[in-house]
């Protein structure tokens, strides 16, 4: 395999330096999906902690002379191998956006692509693979309060994202093999937000500008975990560093959140009011909203042979907005020493300040 791709190593490399060759292997890593929201924050923290970093992605999302970029398809082992050769740790955080409805893309990236990542890691001699999973792998649209990692995988996943995240996490954890010096772990964040977030805040403000944020689903008391992006990154790095000291941690999943559950609508309202938009005032009973969303989904399905309709008002989104779903971080605290670096108050303030360009003029 190495000979087959040695001549390809320059093809996918876009920019960067040879720093990756000047650092001890223990501090060399590759971030798959490093051009994305979470990936960019991960690269920044890794660099600040003295790591040499490769980024593998379908595009180069930023410029940094301290980073080596490799562009390619993660389903293609020849594209992937040069980015993984010579590193000790791979952070795999590539995934289509969770709000997509492209089943084929989810299966290709999260399932097929992850299998390729696992095989290529083994070929390249990578010692640790840390996956960005999701707490949604145990969520079926009903209340979860202080859920632990012992909860079973969802039997009825709420969407293609969750469905393929379950397959992805299982594949990575099952690949753990201490005898062959290949250790894996999965980090399960929930509701990632922060500066440069391309989804939560921009989508929320777009809805507010269109007058779609006047109503809240349910009584507004349902607690949910939202997690600041820097805390998510911190959890990944802790997992990798503790795996180096304790191989017994391999094959495990860890919930990583801000450890401060907050009412779903309170969180959204803080973002909205921080950017000078009105918070939702009116309540729609949860069951009414869910029933209406269910009827709409049936209508969309019936009409699908004639016309393609994209709707954001789905039973899944109603469940996300109207149920309790927050998770225990005790396992991560005990086994990898996790503590959030940034509190919810500071995280919301920093996020709001970073989106000043979306602020509504008073």
Swiss-Prot record:
SUPFAM superfamilies: NAD(P)-binding Rossmann-fold domains. Pathway: Steroid biosynthesis; zymosterol biosynthesis; zymosterol from lanosterol: step 4/6. Pfam families: 3Beta_HSD (PF01073). InterPro entries: 3Beta_OHSteriod_DH/Estase, Lipid_A_modif_metabolic_enz, NAD(P)-bd_dom_sf. It catalyses: a 3beta-hydroxysteroid-4alpha-carboxylate + NADP(+) = a 3-oxosteroid + CO2 + NADPH; a 3beta-hydroxysteroid-4alpha-carboxylate + NAD(+) = a 3-oxosteroid + CO2 + NADH; 4alpha-carboxyzymosterol + NADP(+) = zymosterone + CO2 + NADPH; 4alpha-carboxy-4beta-methyl-5alpha-cholest-8-en-3beta-ol + NADP(+) = 4alpha-methyl-5alpha-cholest-8-en-3-one + CO2 + NADPH. Keywords: Acetylation, Cholesterol biosynthesis, Cholesterol metabolism, Endoplasmic reticulum, Lipid biosynthesis, Lipid droplet, Lipid metabolism, Membrane, NAD, Oxidoreductase, Steroid biosynthesis, Steroid metabolism, Sterol biosynthesis, Sterol metabolism, Transmembrane, Transmembrane helix. It is found in: Endoplasmic reticulum membrane; Lipid droplet. It is a single-pass membrane protein. GO terms for molecular function: 3-beta-hydroxysteroid dehydrogenase (NAD+)/C4-decarboxylase activity; oxidoreductase activity, acting on the CH-OH group of donors, NAD or NADP as acceptor. NAD(+) binds at residue 165. It comes from the Eukaryota. Its EC number is 1.1.1.170. A motif (Prevents secretion from ER) lies at residues 359-362. GO terms for biological process: cholesterol biosynthetic process; cholesterol metabolic process; hair follicle development; labyrinthine layer blood vessel development; smoothened signaling pathway. One of its GO terms (cellular component) is endoplasmic reticulum membrane. The chain crosses the membrane at residues 289-309. The active site is at residue 161. It is an enzyme of class 1 (oxidoreductase). Catalyzes the NAD(P)(+)-dependent oxidative decarboxylation of the C4 methyl groups of 4-alpha-carboxysterols in post-squalene cholesterol biosynthesis. Also plays a role in the regulation of the endocytic trafficking of EGFR. Belongs to the 3-beta-HSD family. Homodimer. This is Sterol-4-alpha-carboxylate 3-dehydrogenase, decarboxylating. It comes from Rattus norvegicus (Rat).
């Amino acid at each position: 395999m190495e000979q087959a791709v040695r001549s390809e190593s320059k093809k996918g490399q876009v920019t960067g330096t040879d720093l990756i060759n000047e650092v001890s292997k223990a501090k060399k890593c590759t971030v798959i999906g490093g051009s994305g929201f979470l990936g960019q924050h991960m690269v920044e923290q890794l660099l600040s902690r003295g790591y040499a970093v490769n980024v593998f992605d379908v595009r180069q999302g930023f410029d940094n002379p301290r980073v080596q970029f490799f562009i390619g398809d993660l389903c293609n082992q020849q594209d992937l191998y040069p980015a993984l050769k010579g590193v000790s740790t791979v952070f795999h955080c590539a995934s289509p956006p969770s709000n997509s409805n492209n089943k084929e893309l989810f299966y290709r990236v999260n399932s097929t692509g992850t299998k390729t990542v696992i095989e290529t890691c083994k070929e390249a001699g990578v010692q640790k693979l840390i996956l960005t999973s999701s707490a949604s792998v145990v969520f079926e649209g009903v209340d979860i309060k202080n859920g632990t990692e012992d909860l079973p995988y969802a039997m009825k996943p709420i969407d293609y994202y969750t469905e393929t995240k379950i397959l992805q996490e299982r594949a990575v954890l099952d690949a753990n093999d201490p005898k062959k010096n290949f250790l894996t772990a999965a980090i399960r964040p929930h509701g990632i937000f922060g500066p440069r977030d391309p989804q939560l805040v921009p989508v929320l403000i777009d809805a507010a500008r269109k007058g779609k944020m006047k109503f809240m689903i349910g009584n507004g008391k349902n607690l949910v975990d939202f997690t600041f992006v820097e805390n998510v990154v911190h959890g990944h790095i802790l997992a990798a560093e503790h795996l180096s000291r304790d191989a017994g941690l391999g094959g495990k999943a860890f919930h990583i959140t801000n450890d401060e559950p907050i009412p779903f609508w309170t969180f959204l309202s803080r973002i909205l009011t921080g950017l000078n938009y009105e918070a939702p005032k009116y309540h729609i009973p949860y069951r009414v909203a869910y029933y209406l969303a269910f009827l709409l989904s049936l209508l969309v399905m019936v009409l699908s042979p004639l016309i393609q309709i994209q709707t954001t008002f789905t039973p899944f989104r109603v469940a996300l907005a109207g149920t309790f779903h927050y998770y225990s971080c005790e396992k991560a605290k005990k086994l990898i020493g996790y503590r959030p670096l940034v509190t919810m108050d500071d995280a919301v303030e920093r996020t709001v300040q970073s989106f000043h360009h979306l602020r509504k003029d008073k």
